[in-house]
Amino acid sequence: MNGLNALNMRQEPKRGAKLAEKLKCEKSSIHYLSILNGNTRGLVWTDDPTAPRLAVVYSYLLGGFQIMGTPLQTAEEYAAFRLFFENKVFPLAKDEFELSEFAYSADTEALSDMMRVVFFDKELFEQKQLVYRTAEEYSAAEMPFIHAAEGRPMRIRRASESFLRENAEFAGAYLPEILESYKSFADFLKHGFAFFVLEGENICGNIISNGEYNGCCIVGADTKAEYRRRGIASALLRTAIEFARERGNEIIWECAEENIPSVRTAESCGMHRCGEFFVRWFEFEPNTPQD
């Protein structure tokens, strides 16, 4: 293989278990494996749909990219890969997805080193992410106490068709986020789950799964600012752990190393740290006005 034809990255519309199996490694992100598997929405480019050596995976939910596979070998391949980003990925990211920066992670250190060479002229920023997993020795524990205001009890409710009909805030504020990862709400209920803490009908906090692969579910949680420091996130995470365990699944929790409350939430629910990775990004240069 010579010249720019040494690497022909193309969009891969047909995703499935075989593609995920061929590209995964020990440190692969569950969220991006779920995209490769076809359970979660995203875009995939590979160098070869039948025997992929390299893949670039885009997440609609995260607005970021994952680099998977094995590193490039030749200068021609590096040049072709950079042109692939310049000619295909960057215009799509800026014009269609309206992104102001290009953010990515890589499955391995070798791929991270490769990307530094590919973007040798970019000013890269980075943030360390920690990965937590349900501990094997985890056992059901008493549900953490939620510190509700006097006379304003809180309850936890699972997302369902009836919840969608009954709670306008869920339908208006949270359903759109879910549909960034799943093609329909029915598809979400088939492959994912969500729990919400309610004060009356007001949603105080949530935990939503955004990918599943090989029995592992990755979740993201958020608590409204005025309800923080009340044990809501821990209660939601423990609820998700119990829900997953009943179905023979495990929970994956990712957070920035500097996000101490999120780290403490994972540890308070008996999760153990099983890995780490870096998110790196650079800002797009503003478009030059055309005469």
What are these regions (language model features)?
Residues 109-123, 234, 257-275:
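Conserved active-site alpha-helix within GNAT-family acetyltransferase domains
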Residues 75-88, 229-242, 264, 268:
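Conserved acetyl-CoA-binding loop-helix of GNAT-fold acetyltransferases
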Residues 221, 251-255:
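Conserved hydrophobic beta-strand within the GNAT/NAT acetyltransferase core sheet
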Residues 133-144, 268, 272, 276-291:
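Terminal substrate-recognition subdomain of acyl/acetyltransferases
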Residues 1-28, 134-183:
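Short amphipathic alpha-helix that is part of the acyltransferase structural core
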Residues 51-53, 202-205, 261:
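Glycine-rich acetyl-CoA-binding "A-motif" of GNAT/NAT acetyltransferases
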Residues 41-43, 48, 52-164:
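Acyl-donor-binding surface of acyltransferase catalytic domains
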Residues 181-216, 220-224:
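A conserved beta-strand-loop-helix scaffold within acyl/acetyltransferase catalytic domains
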